[in-house]
Amino acid sequence: DLAAETGMAMVYVSHDLGAIARVCDRVMVMYAGEIVLEGTTSQVLKTPIHPYAHGLLASIPKLSDAQLPQALDGRPPAPGDAGAGCAFADRCALASDVCRTERPVLQKTPNGEHVRCHHFTDIVQMNSTSALLIDVAQTDTLSKALPILTLGGLSISYQQKGLLDDLSARLFGSEKIFIPTVDDIELEIKRGETVGLVGESGSGKSTILKSLAGLLSPVAGEVLFDTDSSGQSGQLPSIVEARGHEHLRAIQLIFQNPDDSLNPRHTIAEILAQPLTLYFGLTDDALYERSVSILERVRLGAHYLARLPSQLSGGEKQRVAIARAFAAEPDLVLCDEVTSALDVSVQAAVLALLNELKHEKGTTYIFVSHDLAVVKALSDRVVVLYQGRMCEVGPSDAVYSQPSHPYTEVLLGAVLEPDPDSAPKLVADDIVELSPPAKGCAFQRRCPRRIGAICDEMVPPWQRGADGHLIRCHISLDELIRL
């Protein structure tokens, strides 16, 4: 809107192809430092004529897919190491001898695009071929699985901190002000289940993960955890310093930014040695063999052991962070926006890896993401949070179809698809709130389905649909279906 109103030009750099589809008139696709495709947004995103652009689009999870997308094989060449031929040749299904010996020039097509490819005319067939999809790890036995984690009335608050607050507390002994961020979370998670937490920024998703990891202490409620598959859950200490080795091993957190968990001064060998030595007492040859085995599981070779984090790409760092977490052989892995900083091809590879490890180890995941398509593809159940309160819980397929909570409807309507012809369904004059109302429904002020004073005065009841689908709303499920 600003560009249209002011007439200014804009260069927009992003991994988010959905945002590109909404903002840009033209798109340039770059690979190994070169422009490989340039055209109108519609041309590039709907009928890409370069194999790399085609692979990028095929790597994006979509709300319409029930499975994970296939990741691009291989990795980009190191800077200055592209060779004499096409930089993408080693990863390209169309590559021929000429691709490996002769670098393609950027040429103009009859439709006005510019493309760097010897075989761009053959990509029409690739565009008409359905994308390869990966089956998500089967969880047919979840109905019989025992709970591994139970949250009972979990509430978390942050202390309000500011200059006036500190002065008041010191001079007058006034009470500290706490702002509630997570309120009365009741949730049972089964062993081997993947539960996705979704909601806008400030909804409490990451706060819940930090509390489960022992980095934030709740102000109310309890967390029960089963470490030995016995079905006998015990109280989980609220702070990490109070937890024993078994709890520390069993619960691992993968951060959004892998640099938060990788010591820049340590080699990958030293990073992996920490959990392997601490929890299993491995040394010497046994330590080396286990480290190599773990790296191979995340599709990195033994030669990575001598490298520092600064010598890795973003995707490789995240794979090492995942390897470090799984080195402890955890029962529960907390994934906090683990793919948000990655390009779509690396994201697809990381999601496939998490799915593969879940299938191999029966690991339980709590997966936090803003990307609703990623959550749908990877999760067995989804929890929708608004201002720290649960408003919908249910099987992934059920939450993404009707009936749904009005807030879930707003979230799904705002999804940006990588299609310039697909416009998001935004609520008119919608303004994100900084805090929930004092009483009534947390979503009352923004709700496009608000029905009156009852929304302002009374906390909505939980309504139960099929297969354990729960919606917290004053509107009946039958009416939500009609809406």
At which residue positions do the language-model features occur?
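Conserved catalytic motifs of ABC-family nucleotide-binding domains
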Residues: 329
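Conserved ABC ATPase "signature" region
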Residues: 57, 286-303, 412
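P-loop NTP-binding/switch modules centered on Walker-like glycine-rich loops
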Residues: 1-67, 338, 342-421
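Conserved ABC ATPase signature
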Residues: 308-312, 316
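ABC ATPase NBD coupling module
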Residues: 43-48, 77-83, 230-252, 266, ...
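Charged, flexible cofactor/metal-binding loops and thiol motifs
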Residues: 41-148, 161, 165, 395-483
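Helix-to-loop junction immediately C-terminal to a conserved catalytic motif
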Residues: 213
